[in-house]
């Protein structure tokens, strides 16, 4: 008797490949009630690319404690918050800090995707991207779109 080899392009292989990545709509199901303004799918992709470029230049702050410390010191940049972080109390004070200091901020759907964009295997609930000459064009484009989003009431 011979073994029957599984077809590498069969339906099981395709199902496994698709199950690893969730769609934008699936990620929106787990959002916090405070996750406003929420980035669109297109803006989310632009932010991920900008974050990846910022990581290469070491122009990034990640984590609540580090971001809060540097915002208090007066550092400028775009704050990107994950909309699926629980409990909300972990980072609910950060949007207020941003509004007091006129810093742009935006929520994206997934903390795991945010951590992956920052080059980490761990989920990250907040990242601050600082401007730099190497990726200034991408940064300015993201900044303009984030500032055009309506702030919550």
Curated annotation (Swiss-Prot):
Keyword terms: Isopeptide bond, Nucleus, Phosphoprotein, Ribonucleoprotein, Ribosome biogenesis, RNA-binding, rRNA processing, Ubl conjugation
Modified residues (Phosphoserine): 19
Origin superkingdom: Eukaryota
Cross-link Glycyl lysine isopeptide (Lys-Gly) (interchain with G-Cter in SUMO) placement: 5
GO molecular function, one term: box H/ACA snoRNA binding
Glycyl lysine isopeptide (Lys-Gly) (interchain with G-Cter in SUMO1) crosslink site(s): 5
A GO CC term attached to the entry: telomerase holoenzyme complex
Transmembrane segment boundaries: none
Cellular compartments annotated: Nucleus, Nucleolus; Nucleus, Cajal body
Cross-link (Glycyl lysine isopeptide (Lys-Gly) (interchain with G-Cter in SUMO2)) at residue(s): 3, 5
GO biological-process terms attached to the record: rRNA pseudouridine synthesis; telomere maintenance via telomerase
Role of this protein: Required for ribosome biogenesis and telomere maintenance. Part of the H/ACA small nucleolar ribonucleoprotein (H/ACA snoRNP) complex, which catalyzes pseudouridylation of rRNA. This involves the isomerization of uridine such that the ribose is subsequently attached to C5, instead of the normal N1. Each rRNA can contain up to 100 pseudouridine ('psi') residues, which may serve to stabilize the conformation of rRNAs. May also be required for correct processing or intranuclear trafficking of TERC, the RNA component of the telomerase reverse transcriptase (TERT) holoenzyme.
Entry similarity comment: Belongs to the eukaryotic ribosomal protein eL8 family.
Subunit composition and interactions: Part of the H/ACA small nucleolar ribonucleoprotein (H/ACA snoRNP) complex, which contains NHP2/NOLA2, GAR1/NOLA1, NOP10/NOLA3, and DKC1/NOLA4, which is presumed to be the catalytic subunit. The complex contains a stable core formed by binding of one or two NOP10-DKC1 heterodimers to NHP2; GAR1 subsequently binds to this core via DKC1. The complex binds a box H/ACA small nucleolar RNA (snoRNA), which may target the specific site of modification within the RNA substrate. During assembly, the complex contains NAF1 instead of GAR1/NOLA1.
Protein name as annotated: H/ACA ribonucleoprotein complex subunit 2
Source organism (scientific name): Pongo abelii (Sumatran orangutan)
